[in-house]
Protein backbone atom coordinates (compact mmCIF):
# COMPACT_ATOMS: atom_id res chain seq x y z
CA UNK A 1 0.00 0.00 0.00
CA UNK A 2 1.41 3.36 -1.03
CA UNK A 3 0.57 6.39 1.07
CA UNK A 4 2.63 8.91 -0.86
CA UNK A 5 1.22 11.20 -3.49
CA UNK A 6 2.54 14.08 -5.51
CA UNK A 7 2.04 17.51 -3.98
CA UNK A 8 2.28 20.74 -5.87
CA UNK A 9 4.84 23.23 -4.60
CA UNK A 10 1.95 25.43 -3.42
CA UNK A 11 0.25 22.63 -1.49
CA UNK A 12 3.59 21.69 0.08
CA UNK A 13 4.10 25.30 1.16
CA UNK A 14 0.53 25.47 2.50
CA UNK A 15 0.96 22.28 4.52
CA UNK A 16 4.25 23.50 5.98
CA UNK A 17 2.66 26.84 6.91
CA UNK A 18 -0.18 25.03 8.69
CA UNK A 19 2.26 22.81 10.56
CA UNK A 20 4.22 25.90 11.62
CA UNK A 21 0.93 27.42 12.79
CA UNK A 22 0.31 24.38 15.02
CA UNK A 23 3.81 24.63 16.49
CA UNK A 24 3.51 28.40 17.02
CA UNK A 25 0.21 27.87 18.84
CA UNK A 26 1.89 25.49 21.30
CA UNK A 27 4.89 27.78 21.75
CA UNK A 28 2.70 30.80 22.49
CA UNK A 29 0.56 28.77 24.89
CA UNK A 30 3.63 27.78 26.89
CA UNK A 31 4.82 31.39 26.92
CA UNK A 32 1.39 32.61 28.12
CA UNK A 33 1.16 34.87 25.07
CA UNK A 34 -2.64 35.29 24.98
CA UNK A 35 -2.57 38.07 22.39
CA UNK A 36 -0.20 36.09 20.18
CA UNK A 37 -2.32 32.95 20.45
CA UNK A 38 -5.52 34.76 19.53
CA UNK A 39 -3.82 36.37 16.53
CA UNK A 40 -3.29 32.90 15.03
CA UNK A 41 -7.03 32.39 14.56
CA UNK A 42 -9.50 33.91 12.13
CA UNK A 43 -12.59 35.69 13.43
CA UNK A 44 -14.77 32.78 12.24
CA UNK A 45 -12.53 29.99 13.54
CA UNK A 46 -13.79 26.69 14.89
CA UNK A 47 -11.72 25.17 17.72
CA UNK A 48 -12.67 21.62 18.72
CA UNK A 49 -10.99 19.76 21.59
CA UNK A 50 -11.24 16.05 22.41
CA UNK A 51 -9.94 15.20 25.89
CA UNK A 52 -11.75 11.89 26.40
CA UNK A 53 -10.22 9.20 24.19
CA UNK A 54 -13.22 6.94 24.85
CA UNK A 55 -15.70 9.45 23.42
CA UNK A 56 -16.37 10.65 19.90
CA UNK A 57 -17.95 13.81 21.29
CA UNK A 58 -15.77 16.89 21.72
CA UNK A 59 -15.02 18.21 25.18
CA UNK A 60 -15.08 21.73 23.76
CA UNK A 61 -16.47 23.07 20.48
CA UNK A 62 -15.77 26.79 20.31
CA UNK A 63 -16.67 29.09 17.46
CA UNK A 64 -15.12 32.46 16.84
CA UNK A 65 -11.90 34.02 18.09
CA UNK A 66 -13.62 35.72 21.05
CA UNK A 67 -14.71 32.32 22.42
CA UNK A 68 -11.06 31.29 22.68
CA UNK A 69 -9.99 34.12 25.00
CA UNK A 70 -11.16 32.58 28.30
CA UNK A 71 -9.72 29.18 27.35
CA UNK A 72 -6.29 30.59 26.55
CA UNK A 73 -6.37 32.94 29.55
CA UNK A 74 -7.02 29.92 31.80
CA UNK A 75 -3.44 28.77 31.10
CA UNK A 76 -2.35 31.53 33.50
CA UNK A 77 -3.79 29.47 36.37
CA UNK A 78 -1.01 26.87 35.94
CA UNK A 79 2.52 27.11 37.32
CA UNK A 80 3.88 25.84 34.00
CA UNK A 81 2.65 24.18 30.81
CA UNK A 82 4.34 22.10 28.15
CA UNK A 83 2.60 21.26 24.88
CA UNK A 84 4.12 18.43 22.81
CA UNK A 85 2.81 18.24 19.25
CA UNK A 86 2.21 14.93 17.53
CA UNK A 87 0.86 13.99 14.13
CA UNK A 88 -1.40 16.23 12.09
CA UNK A 89 -3.78 15.45 9.25
CA UNK A 90 -4.33 18.37 6.93
CA UNK A 91 -6.69 18.69 3.96
CA UNK A 92 -6.05 21.64 1.65
CA UNK A 93 -8.69 22.67 -0.88
CA UNK A 94 -7.73 25.88 -2.65
CA UNK A 95 -7.62 28.68 -0.09
CA UNK A 96 -9.43 26.61 2.57
CA UNK A 97 -7.95 23.97 4.85
CA UNK A 98 -9.13 21.72 7.64
CA UNK A 99 -7.04 19.65 9.94
CA UNK A 100 -6.70 17.55 13.02
CA UNK A 101 -3.66 17.71 15.27
CA UNK A 102 -2.67 15.61 18.24
CA UNK A 103 -1.07 17.25 21.24
CA UNK A 104 -0.03 16.12 24.68
CA UNK A 105 -0.43 18.99 27.13
CA UNK A 106 1.15 18.95 30.57
CA UNK A 107 -0.26 21.47 33.04
CA UNK A 108 1.65 21.84 36.30
CA UNK A 109 -0.27 23.02 39.35
CA UNK A 110 1.29 24.08 42.64
CA UNK A 111 -0.90 22.52 45.31
CA UNK A 112 1.29 23.45 48.29
CA UNK A 113 -1.16 26.03 49.57
CA UNK A 114 -4.16 23.69 49.53
CA UNK A 115 -2.65 20.32 50.36
CA UNK A 116 -3.62 18.82 53.69
CA UNK A 117 -2.38 15.71 55.41
CA UNK A 118 -4.63 13.03 56.77
CA UNK A 119 -3.78 11.69 60.24
What positions do the PLM features span?
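Short, cysteine-centered beta-strand-loop-beta hairpins and adjacent loop/turn segments enriched
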Residues: 106-116
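A solvent-exposed, acidic/Ser-Thr-rich amphipathic alpha-helical stretch
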Residues: 34-105
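Short, surface-exposed coil-to-beta transition loops
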Residues: 83-85, 116-119
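Short beta-strand edge/turn micro-motifs at domain boundaries
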Residues: 2, 96-100, 118-119
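Short, low-complexity N-terminal intrinsically disordered segments enriched in polar/charged residues
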Residues: 1-43
Amino acid sequence: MTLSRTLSPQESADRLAIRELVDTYAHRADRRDLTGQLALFTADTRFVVYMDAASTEPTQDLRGRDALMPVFDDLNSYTATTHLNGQSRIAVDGDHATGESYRLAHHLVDWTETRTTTP
